[in-house]
Amino acid sequence: MKKIILSAVALLSLLALFGCNNRAEVQALQPASYAELTPMQQSWRGVLPCADCAGIETSLFLEKDGTWVMNERYQGAKVPTVIASWGTWARTADKLVLTDSDGEKRYFHARGEQLEMLDSEGKAISSSFNYTLSPVKASLPTTPIAMKGMYFYMAEAAVFTDCATGRRFAVSSNAQLERDYAAARDGEQKPVLLVAQAHFSLEPNPESGAMQKTLVVGSHSRFESNKDCRD
């Protein structure tokens, strides 16, 4: 009986370690904590197969706040194309699940120190081509990402709340953006919808000095007064 109990405890501990439970996958997905991420690299790069180009140079960055950024450069394309995307990530027992800002999912599987891309249903791809990303040390990409959210500025600090995910980010200091916001809010101290081309960066927190994920808003951005995320 003692052996049975010990075996049961060991099994439960193993299941807890890998985040397994008997719910459906959608219910099981939770933003992973930093402790869960520790055994994995935080950034990867590789060239993934492409149907109509030489390959897709792919860089993936996982952040401790449960978000990710991906940069994809299409090699040998007739028109140079670079696409940046972002969203939230979560772990299941055997998969890394990336959900982008439009709700679309991409799946990867940890194989040693590498990440192996899975198909659209989260299953292994049977192919002679290389679908793996290798660990690297790299900075966040500066390729602009189309974003929409509520911008609020007060006490010399700006915050952007993304419409698609509800995530909040500090905004890098931008005098022109602050002037545009002042004009758009029409004298009221309120959030205003911002449609932006932006990228993420790591910048020191003005108060603590600790590095934090910050949104850098580009010049091709605009405020839309009297609108919100529902519009």
What are these regions (language model features)?
Residues 1-8:
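Bacterial N-terminal signal peptides that target proteins for export
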Residues 10-12:
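Core hydrophobic alpha-helical transmembrane segments of single-pass membrane proteins
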Residues 14-17:
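Bacterial Sec-type N-terminal signal peptides, specifically the leucine/valine-rich hydrophobic h-region
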Residues 20-84, 98-154, 163-170, 189, ...:
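Lipid interaction determinants
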